Amino acid sequence: MTNDPDAELIEAGRKLFAGDWQFFWASPSIETLPPMQGIEIALAGRSNVGKSSLINALTGRNALARTSHTPGRTQELIFFKGPGPLDAQTPELRLVDMPGYGYASAPKTKIASWTTLIHRYLLGRANLARVYVLIDSRHGFKDADDEVLTTLDKSAVSYQIVLTKTDQVKKSALDETMAAMAEKLRKHPAAYPEMLVTSSRDGAGMAEMRAAIVKLLRERA
């Protein structure tokens, strides 16, 4: 039995995501959201930033969340649920795969519909504990990301930046991106101060992200 709190969180995170995760609900509109139960954590980001791949990597399941190379494919809020509360201090978790934003080639009416759905969900979901805003480390921060962070700043929702696809950039370039992101976040005081650095392809950062989620769940218990 370890007394290292970080090691304990990592082990708890491993157990949480090693359970039976499955698709639970799809909501094309705010009116069709599932009943609020447990704690929800949402993944937001530009189209093709790697939200579905990250969910698959976190849960260790290659096809839990459907991935696509076609930007804008996810058009609904997709809910996934785990096996239930991990223990007395760690409540039930649901993951939410949100429609990608910033896909300019989609029809304007569809973009407007996605935007409305995303914003209404972010502002009106009492059991939403945190939004992980995914940023493609190859491309960095874009105007569409800034708009979403501004929306989150105006809400009561905690959010944190997750850099994705870090296996595809050199360390020097990644360091530059992280420095630029840190500077950007100075303008967004509601952002969680630490960034998560991940790769769904090689698993980098997954243990740390699972541990961070367990810590958050316990804080909300």
UniProtKB/Swiss-Prot annotation:
Residues at which Mg(2+) binds: 52, 74
Co-factor(s): Mg(2+)
Cellular component, GO, one term: cytosol
This protein's UniProt keywords: Cell cycle, Cell division, GTP-binding, Magnesium, Metal-binding, Nucleotide-binding, Septation
Annotated GTP binding sites: 45-52, 72-76, 97-100, 164-167, 198-200
Gene Ontology molecular function: any one: GTP binding
Alphabetical list of PROSITE patterns matching this protein: G_ENGB (PS51706)
CDD domains in the cross-refs: YihA_EngB
Domain EngB-type G: 37-219
Entry function: Necessary for normal cell division and for the maintenance of normal septation.
Family: Belongs to the TRAFAC class TrmE-Era-EngA-EngB-Septin-like GTPase superfamily. EngB GTPase family.
Protein known as: Probable GTP-binding protein EngB
